[in-house]
UniProtKB/Swiss-Prot annotation:
Its main location: cytoplasm. A zinc finger (C4-type) spans 34-56. Pathway: Lipid metabolism; malonyl-CoA biosynthesis; malonyl-CoA from acetyl-CoA: step 1/1. It catalyses: N(6)-carboxybiotinyl-L-lysyl-[protein] + acetyl-CoA = N(6)-biotinyl-L-lysyl-[protein] + malonyl-CoA. This is Acetyl-coenzyme A carboxylase carboxyl transferase subunit beta. It is found in: Cytoplasm. Signal peptide: none annotated. PANTHER family: ACETYL-COENZYME A CARBOXYLASE CARBOXYL TRANSFERASE SUBUNIT BETA, CHLOROPLASTIC. Zn(2+) binds at C34, C37, C53, C56. Binds 1 zinc ion per subunit.
Length: 294
């Protein structure tokens, strides 16, 4: 009996089943990995949360039309100037090929979508830049669409809300691209002089000529958390000033801390915030007559 305690355990036998070489296919896009916290989540759950990570709050990129759908009242959006597209004014080699690829990738004709809509019944003109199209760089068409949208807001006496996301001026259009900085800024100024309300919401990334022109000209200047906002790149600035910059330099949190933003708002709270601001700025007719449309 004692000998049984010291007997060697019997080895288990395992059978090897040959593989046929095939792998179970997981449908593409069903899961998304957060680049910030590295957690993996169902894409549908991420979309339900407005593309904001459930674990760390990272704001994933979102297309222009998807952003409009999540903000405005259902069925209220009426797009304007949707057919405008660049004509390659400088004859830049392969520029139109790149434009066509971006059209197919994004489903847009240009890097911005503009139109009329309502948020909780409050009317507005809205413009949303889309970084999938030439990194939302500002060329002549982008500048023209912003200009026309602001003019529409002025004529219809509606607030103007713009979401920025851009790599800057579009180099393939040269000076015509740079001219849009002055053109859009002048339109903002004229609208402001007429008493119009402008709200800018800077998203990741808002850089270059866009950040240096209309992006910060709103009556309210907001940003999404973690957005990169600045003119020149971090490395260029460090080499110029010969100083090491803070870790959070050029982030929306850094700008808020230094008084360059009015607020840093989560995408989850943005609709309520905009609705409240629009509601308190509604222009009502004056007693005994209509309000001055100028």
């Amino acid at each position: 009996m004692l000998g049984d305690l010291f007997t060697k355990p019997k080895k288990r036998k395992y059978a090897t089943i040959p593989s046929d070489g095939t792998k179970a296919d997981v449908p593409e896009g069903i899961m998304t990995k957060c680049p910030e916290c590295k957690k993996i989540m169902y894409t549908k759950e991420l979309q339900k949360n407005l593309m904001v990570c459930n674990y760390c709050g990272f704001h994933h990129p979102i297309g222009a039309k998807a952003r409009i759908d999540m903000l405005v009242d259902e069925g209220s959006f009426e797009e304007i100037d949707a057919s405008l597209t660049t004509a390659n004014p400088l004859g830049f080699e392969d520029y139109m090929d790149r434009i066509e690829k971006d059209k197919q990738k994004s489903g847009l004709n240009e890097a911005i979508v503009t139109g009329h809509a309502t948020i909780d019944g409050n009317p507005l003109v809205i413009a949303v830049m889309d970084s999938r199209f030439r990194m939302a760089s500002m060329g002549s068409v982008v500048g023209e669409k912003i200009f026309r949208a602001v003019e529409d807001a002025d004529k219809t006496n509606k607030p103007f809300v713009i979401f920025t996301a851009s790599g800057g001026a579009r180099m393939q259009e040269g000076m015509l691209s740079l001219m849009q900085m002055a053109k859009t800024s002048a339109a903002f100024k004229r609208f402001s002089n007429h008493g119009g309300l402008i709200i800018t919401v800077m998203t990741h990334p808002t850089t270059g000529g866009v950040s240096a022109s209309f992006a910060s000209l709103g009556d309210y200047n907001f940003a999404e958390p973690g957005a990169l906002i600045g003119f020149a790149g971090r490395r260029v600035i460090e080499q110029t000033v010969r100083e090491e910059l803070p870790e959070d330099f050029q982030t929306s949190e850094f700008l808020l801390k230094h008084g360059q933003l009015d607020d840093c708002i989560s995408r989850l709270d943005l609709q309520n915030k905009l609705s409240f601001i629009l509601s308190i700025h509604v222009k009502t007719p004056e007693v005994g007559g209509e309000a001055d449309g100028e």
